[in-house]
Regions:
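Extended alpha-helical assembly domains of large eukaryotic scaffold proteins
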Residues: 1-228
Length: 228
């Protein structure tokens, strides 16, 4: 910051090599300055996916901005173990809990969708879920419910003829908690037609999770068999 004051306004960077730069001030004076080499080194480690080396560098420097950069790089590269380490070092409890939640998702597509959602790309997250093999319909519906995108959640449920009662159940809870009555015509129709059984909805949710676990196990077995 002090160097920025010395450079003054309308200064131009002439060269930047390694951690050294030359700046020409508005009055024509040529000045040199240096920056920390650690962000550059960290960037090299992240690009090469050398996560242990990156974490070791951050522990040595003990800089929160450096940990933050590592967390961002790890999340962007879907390396959740390193993201967990970085967020724990920063004591970002809420973000750490979210990463732990993502790590607990059985299927890679589910994890990738949550990362996209974390990066504020909900449409991309939905696309990942619906284009999975098999499509993760329940997760796509629940994601839209979490985002209060009720019409989209219902649209997916009706298109695939699955979990319409789940959408209605959470919609009803939402309206009740906000002391509101239903005004959307299609939701009104379905509330009159569809039975909402909380136990049945919970059972279907459990079955969806079991199915994801089964698929994850079968994929793991296939990968192991492919090694021989």
């Amino acid at each position: 910051e002090q160097e920025g004051v010395l450079f003054g306004k309308h200064s131009n960077i002439i060269s930047f090599f390694g951690s050294h730069l030359k700046v020409r001030r508005a009055d024509g004076a040529l000045m040199t300055a240096s920056v920390s080499p650690y962000p550059i080194e960290l960037d090299k480690f992240v690009k090469k996916r050398q996560w242990e080396e990156a974490a070791r560098l951050c522990r040595f420097v003990k800089s929160e901005p450096l940990w933050a950069a590592l967390a961002g790089g790890a999340i962007g590269s879907l390396h959740l173990d390193t993201a967990e380490i970085a967020l724990a070092a920063m004591k970002e409890v809420d973000k750490l809990h979210y990463i732990l939640y993502i790590k607990d998702i059985p299927l890679e597509e589910g994890q990738n969708a949550e990362i996209a959602l974390y990066q504020r790309r909900p449409d991309e997250a939905e696309r990942i879920l619906l284009q999975a093999n098999p499509p993760l319909i329940y997760r796509a519906i629940k994601m839209n419910i979490r985002l209060f995108r009720w019409k989209r959640a219902l649209q997916i449920a009706e298109r695939h003829k699955k979990h319409i009662d789940t959408v209605l159940y959470y919609r009803q809870k939402f309206l009740t908690s906000h002391n509101r009555s239903e005004e959307e015509p299609r939701f009104k129709e379905l509330f009159a037609e569809v039975e909402i059984n909380e136990d049945a909805i919970a059972e279907k949710k459990a079955k969806e999770h079991e199915e994801e676990e089964r698929i994850a196990d079968s994929r793991g077995s296939s990968r192991k068999e492919g090694k021989f």
